[in-house]
Curated annotation (Swiss-Prot):
It comes from Rattus norvegicus (Rat). PANTHER family: FASCICULATION AND ELONGATION PROTEIN ZETA-2, ZYGIN. The modification Phosphoserine is found at S130, S171, S190. InterPro entries: FEZ (IPR011680). Homodimer; disulfide-linked. May form heterodimers with FEZ1. Interacts with synaptotagmin. This is Fasciculation and elongation protein zeta-2. The gene is Fez2.
Length: 375
């Protein structure tokens, strides 16, 4: 009987037969479902049970139902909050005081090694703003320069020489060692100039040291722009200097060629005069001989001279005489001096005339067509 009572208690926890059958129908295979459908009325019961389960699972929430808590995602922080080891490590982290560097043993060893001593600020010393203003006025470069200019006016070289001569005349004896000589005075003057330069440089350095970073950047930009402008000006001046030097060389070569041609023309004129004198003397001698020979009107020498003169006029001068040395170069006076190109062309013509070259006519035509009568 005891065994029947135990089984009776066990039967109370079992589900009814219908529910077991429904579970079997749910877990059955498609073939079994197909057989049940073919068998009879089990399919409507299965469909109704499925609808009941779906309605229980997806039933709508009503006001009578208690509110459900929102689903929260599991994060690393939520996991660490429940971790005992993490809590033990982080609970005492904020309670530890930071290390005081000044009172540490490492700091004392550091001071002993570097041999540093801390000097306290003496608050008892009074600070006067008037001293700072006086120092600023003393270091003002503009005021220093203006005061120097007002006190000592600039002297010209002639005034300095006159003053030195007066000092030399006023000195009673040159042999006296106590009176300083001219070289000593000049050396003293140079020393004063050097001291003035050094003081101005030191004051400029102090002013630069007192400038801020922004002011230094502005000063640097101004210096760079000034350097750029001065560089461009220097390039222009160098180019102008080269042009002036080239122009000077062309002018010097033209003047030297002109002087050489003029000297050769003078020599040629002198030789021509001597030849004329000799010819005149020979012609007078021939006339005298002709007067002594009344029967002969023409001589062989006279006929040969006439023939030679005709040939010279027809085919030019003989080989010994200069043909192009006495060439006249046409020149038109303009408002200003001749240009460098004109001087170069004239120099070429003068060199050709000096060498008695055959290029003189072609150079003259080019000069007339390009310079005097340009098309």
């Amino acid at each position: 009987m005891a065994a029947d009572g135990d089984w009776q208690d066990f039967y109370e926890f079992q589900e009814p037969a219908g529910s077991v059958r429904d579970q079997e129908n749910c877990n059955a295979s498609p073939e079994a479902g197909a057989g049940a459908h073919a068998g009879g009325d089990s399919f409507p019961a299965l469909a109704s049970s499925l609808e009941e389960k779906l309605s229980l699972c997806f039933r709508p929430t009503s006001d009578a139902d208690p509110p459900r808590a929102a689903v929260r995602p599991i994060t690393e922080r939520s996991l660490l909050q429940g971790d005992e080891i993490w809590n033990a490590l982080t609970d005492n982290y904020g309670n530890v005081m930071p290390v005081d560097w000044k009172s540490s043993h490492t700091r004392t060893l550091h001071l002993l090694t570097l041999n540093l001593t801390e000097k306290g600020m003496s608050d008892g010393l009074p600070f006067d703003t008037s001293d700072e203003e006086e120092l600023r006025e003393q270091l003002d470069m503009h005021s220093i320069i203006v005061s120097c200019v007002n006190e000592e006016p600039l002297f010209t070289a002639d005034q300095v020489i006159e003053e030195i001569e007066e000092m030399m005349q006023e000195s009673p004896d040159l042999e006296d060692d106590e009176t300083p000589t001219q070289s000593d005075r000049l050396s003293m003057l140079s020393q004063e100039i050097q001291t003035l330069k050094s003081s101005s440089m030191s004051s400029c350095e102090e002013r630069v040291k007192r400038l801020s970073v922004s002011e230094l950047n502005e000063l640097l930009e101004e210096i760079e722009t000034a350097i750029k402008e001065y560089s461009e000006e220097l390039v222009q001046q160098l180019a102008l200097r080269d042009e002036l030097e080239f122009e000077k060389e062309v002018e010097n070569s033209f003047i030297s060629a002109l002087i050489e041609v003029q000297n050769k023309q003078k020599e040629h004129k002198e030789t021509a005069k001597k030849k004329k004198k000799l010819k005149n003397g020979s012609s007078q001698n021939g006339r005298n001989e002709r007067s002594h020979m009344p029967g002969t009107r023409f001589s062989m020498e006279g006929i040969s001279n006439v023939i030679q003169n005709g040939l010279r006029h027809t085919f030019g001068n003989s080989g010994g005489e200069k043909q192009y040395l006495t060439t006249v170069i046409p020149y038109e006076k303009k408002n200003g001096p001749p240009s460098v190109e004109d001087l170069q062309i004239l120099t070429k013509i003068l060199h050709a005339m000096k060498e008695d070259s055959e290029k003189v006519p072609s150079l003259l035509t080019d000069y007339i067509l390009k310079v005097l009568c340009p098309t």
